[in-house]
Amino acid sequence: HLLQFNKMIKFETRKNAIPFYAF
């Protein structure tokens, strides 16, 4: 499910200044 996770990352990146995966 790497592609789905990638889409989630892009969504979070657009929604937040700091991506959630940075933590």
From Swiss-Prot:
Task: Name the Enzyme Commission number(s) assigned to this protein.
Answer: 3.1.1.4
Q: How is the cofactor bound?
A: Binds 1 Ca(2+) ion.
Q: How is it modified after translation?
A: Contains 7 disulfide bonds.
* Protein's UniProt keywords contain Hydrolase: yes
Q: Provide this UniProt record's keywords sorted from A to Z.
A: Calcium, Disulfide bond, Hydrolase, Lipid degradation, Lipid metabolism, Metal-binding, Neurotoxin, Presynaptic neurotoxin, Secreted, Toxin
The answer to whether UniProt assigns keyword Lipid metabolism to this entry is: yes
- One BP annotation, GO: lipid catabolic process
- Where does the record say this protein resides? Secreted
Q: Name any cofactors this protein relies on.
A: Ca(2+)
Tissue specificity, per the record, is: Expressed by the venom gland.
One GO CC annotation: extracellular region
Could you tell me which cysteines form disulfide bridges?
A: none
Q: Which domain of life is it from?
A: Eukaryota
Which GO MF terms are attached to this record? metal ion binding; phospholipase A2 activity; toxin activity
The chemistry this enzyme catalyses reads: a 1,2-diacyl-sn-glycero-3-phosphocholine + H2O = a 1-acyl-sn-glycero-3-phosphocholine + a fatty acid + H(+)
Family as reported in the entry's similarity comment: Belongs to the phospholipase A2 family. Group II subfamily.
Protein's job: Snake venom phospholipase A2 (PLA2) that shows presynaptic neurotoxicity. PLA2 catalyzes the calcium-dependent hydrolysis of the 2-acyl groups in 3-sn-phosphoglycerides.
Q: How does it assemble?
A: Heterodimer of an acidic subunit and a basic chain. The acidic subunit is non-toxic, without enzymatic activity and comprises 3 peptides that are cross-linked by 7 disulfide bridges. The basic subunit is toxic, has phospholipase A2 activity and is composed of a single chain.
**Annotated protein name in UniProt:** Basic phospholipase A2 CB1
Q: Which organism is it from?
A: Crotalus basiliscus
